[in-house]
Curated annotation (Swiss-Prot):
PANTHER family: TRIFUNCTIONAL ENZYME SUBUNIT ALPHA, TRIFUNCTIONAL ENZYME SUBUNIT ALPHA, MITOCHONDRIAL
Lineage: Bacteria, Pseudomonadati, Pseudomonadota, Gammaproteobacteria, Enterobacterales
This enzyme's EC code(s): 4.2.1.17, 5.1.2.3, 1.1.1.35
Family that this chain belongs to: In the N-terminal section; belongs to the enoyl-CoA hydratase/isomerase family. In the central section; belongs to the 3-hydroxyacyl-CoA dehydrogenase family.
Protein name per the record: Fatty acid oxidation complex subunit alpha
Chain's gene name: fadJ
Gene Ontology terms for molecular function: 3-hydroxybutyryl-CoA epimerase activity; enoyl-CoA hydratase activity; long-chain-3-hydroxyacyl-CoA dehydrogenase activity; NAD+ binding
Organism name: Escherichia coli (strain 55989 / EAEC)
Length: 714
């Protein structure tokens, strides 16, 4: 084989053929269309060598088997027929591997996802390592697609239809032991003996198919299957609100294969893959994937980052505890928490204990590893142990004087190189750094709650922040598993600035007589994970509304909340879920299904709760304000690019991913159409709906924010 080949054949002395996968010049192995000829050439050699006893596929990469297919291949397809042909080519290749007359074994270490798992499924047996990096899954649904190289047909037959549907419909990734339990792999071994075990398995007869559990056998029959697909269909429709066509097609394709046989199943899979690749939903989801990959490569500034060996945290509350957890347990850095109250330190330590203990219970972590990670976190009520911290994150109350005091104390009690990062959600970083002796080392690092789940962080340099401080803070955020966007130091930054008018408008509609559940249901149907009213309850009404006066002072009356409504709610001791009552009433702690709208909320805010607006009217009033503010943020350079704006909205507030973010959504509607809608709303409801100048100009010129491809900016 030529040197640049991604697949290399080596026949051992014991007549086992080892095919090594190593895509040249790439950290990750991904499958590309041009590899088909390489694999076919190897298959031809395998068929011609009658001495061979077995075949093993193994990766030369240190931490991945095959991470999936190269998504750019799909973007290059101009029609559904071209994408369908791509799927059929993949199916044919997998069929040729499966048809080899000798045992074929996949030796899996690291990520085995998408097309990688489909290749492993085409093999006759699979062995994987017990390493935490080893995960197996079919995540195509997250890109608005389905597995197109036989995965929808092979997986249900291997592990059972019910389990397979859960994996394919959610994109869920399995760890090694879960995969073994379900029968997805035949053995789990240490990395050091992976190839040896795979070779031994290849020397035996083909592994016989493992009998499915009784439940799966029942569900495979016509009656059980009909019941299962009806049930799963309802559940999926409720979860996706009909916004993700891929889930419906997955159900259809899997059922076709089981009811009509694999030939019909493969045909349906290829056709569905081709059609889904052309949907706006898949194009938007792929654009988010490319944008987030791009952001993760962005260093934030041209300067090299400073070393990070240890971190300090001020404040042991919910945010401080969450930040300590991701820093110690994901980055592996020692963390020192300072809180004036020992209870605060205990709270933060318990937070990490609870997270890690949950992993131990689910068998994702060994108890010894839990103890090792917990040992990285320590606490103090003074500044002992802070002298040599490289970066200190402040997570105290939203009070400017208090934060300025924290800066002064940190500068007195830490090293000259220490960075001070404030987890403020609204206060200008320039004001926090106003009296600093080292203002170039002060920066904003805004996490979202809950810290361990929310993928976004906003990094906010003020005018005097150094390039190295930016680069170092971006480096830490990435190590914490976050997607960082660098935003300008203006009131509300980016995420809260576009979120505030959206929530304000929802409250305004309440005062006009709309019902809480109607507003929330409409925005969930639109594609948000929760509605705006429920979101305010979840964040905390007191916390969520603190930013309104800050934004109103900075940007004027378009940020005004309906008069006296917020104060009436807070004066009635309504904080949301955290104290059991907000717009909704909540049952016992931890029982999320118990929430219900509190009818007393309507008289409290002087409303009737007799709704008259249609769903599209409710949605456009909330969403158009968010879009308009997002465009202002680009115009004022609050965000560095529309890429960051789309990522910030999707990862920070759950803007519908299938719409691709605010800027992709504006492009899909057309700037001119957005302007027309906003002008109509401005006539009906007031000047807050006046479209910003940039939007009007783009509408007049027929311009868009993105080019037509998934990856290119205009």
């Amino acid at each position: 084989m030529e040197m640049t080949s991604a697949f290399t054949l080596n026949v051992r002395l014991d007549n086992i053929a080892v095919i090594t996968i190593d895509v040249p010049g790439e950290k990750m192995n991904t499958l590309k269309a041009e590899f088909a000829s390489q694999v076919r050439a190897i298959i031809k050699q395998l068929r011609e060598n009658k001495e061979l006893r077995g075949v093993v596929f193994v990766s030369a990469k240190p931490d991945n088997f095959i991470a999936g297919a190269d998504i750019n291949m799909i973007g290059n397809c101009k029609t559904a027929q071209e994408a369908e042909a791509l799927a059929r080519q993949g199916q044919q290749l997998m069929a040729e591997i499966h048809a080899l007359p000798i045992p074929v074994i996949a030796a899996i270490h690291g990520a085995c996802l998408g097309g990688g798992l489909e290749l492993a499924l085409a093999c006759h047996g699979r062995v994987c390592t017990d390493d935490p990096k080893t995960v197996l899954g079919l995540p195509e649904v997250q890109l608005g697609l389905l597995p197109g190289s036989g995965g929808t047909q092979r997986l249900p037959r291997l592990i059972g239809v019910s389990t397979a549907l859960e994996m394919i419909l959610t994109g869920k990734q399995l760890r090694a032991k879960q995969a073994l339990k379900l029968g997805l792999v035949d053995d789990v071994v240490p990395h050091s003996i992976l190839l040896e075990v795979a070779v031994e398995l290849a020397k035996k007869d083909r592994p016989s198919s493992r009998p499915l559990p009784v439940r799966e056998r029942i569900l495979a029959g016509p009656l059980g299957r009909a019941l299962l697909f009806k049930m799963v269909g309802k559940k999926t429709e409720h979860k996706t609100q009909g916004n993700y066509p891929a889930t419906e097609r997955i159900l259809e394709v899997v059922e076709t294969g089981l009811a009509q046989g694999t030939s019909s199943g493969y045909d349906a899979e290829a056709r569905a893959f081709g059609e889904l690749a052309m949907t706006p939903q898949s194009q938007a989801l792929r654009s988010i994937f490319f944008a987030s990959t791009d952001v993760k490569k962005d260093p934030g500034s041209d300067a090299p980052p400073a070393p990070l060996n240890s971190v300090g945290i001020l404040g042991g509350g919910l945010m401080g505890g969450g930040i300590a957890y991701v820093t110690a347990c994901k980055v592996g850095l020692p963390v020192r928490i300072k809180d004036i109250n020992p209870q605060g330190i205990n709270h933060a330590l318990k937070y990490s204990w609870d997270q890690l203990e949950g992993k131990v219970r689910r068998r994702h972590l060994k108890a010894s590893e839990r103890d090792k990670q917990l040992a990285l976190i320590s606490g103090t009520t003074d500044y002992r142990g802070f002298a040599h911290r490289d970066l200190i994150i402040e997570a105290v109350f939203e009070n400017l004087e208090l934060k300025q005091q924290m800066v002064a104390e940190v500068e007195q009690n830490s090293a000259a190189h220490t960075i001070f990062a404030s987890n403020t959600s609204s206060l200008p970083i320039g004001d926090i750094a106003a009296h600093a002796t080292r203002p170039e080392q002060v920066i904003g690092l805004h996490f979202f709650s809950p810290v361990e789940k929310m993928p976004l962080v906003e990094i906010i340099p003020h005018a005097g922040t150094s390039a190295q401080t930016i680069a170092t803070t971006v480096k830490l955020a990435k190590k914490q598993g976050k997607t960082p966007i660098v935003v300008r130091d203006k009131a509300g930054f980016y995420v809260n600035r576009i979120l505030a008018p959206y929530i304000n408008e929802a409250i305004r509609m309440l005062t006009e007589g709309e019902r809480v559940e109607h507003i929330d249901a409409v925005l969930v149907k639109f594609g948000f994970p929760v509605g705006p009213i429920q979101l305010l309850d979840e964040v905390g009404i007191d916390t969520g509304t603190k930013i309104i006066p800050v934004l109103e002072a900075a940007y004027g009356e378009r940020f005004s909340a309906p008069a006296n409504v917020v104060s009436s709610i807070l004066n009635d001791d309504r904080k949301g879920r955290k104290n059991g009552r907000g717009f909704y009433l909540y049952g016992q702690k931890g029982r999320k299904s118990k929430k219900q709208v509190d009818p007393a909320i309507y008289p409290l805010i002087g409303a009737q709760g007799q709704g008259r607006l249609s769903a599209p009217q409710v949605a456009e009033r909330c969403v158009m304000l968010m879009l308009n503010e997002a465009v202002r943020c680009v115009d004022e350079q609050v965000i560095r690019s529309v890429r960051d704006g789309d990522i910030g909205a999707v990862f920070g507030i759950g803007f519908p991913p299938f719409l691709g973010g605010p800027f992709r959504y504006i492009d899909s509607l057309g700037a001119g159409e957005v302007v027309a809608i906003m002008q109509r709303l401005a006539t009906q409801y007031g000047s807050r709906f006046t479209p910003c100048e940039r939007l009007v100009e783009m509408g007049a010129r027929g311009e868009s924010f993105w080019k037509t491809t998934a990856t290119d900016l205009q």
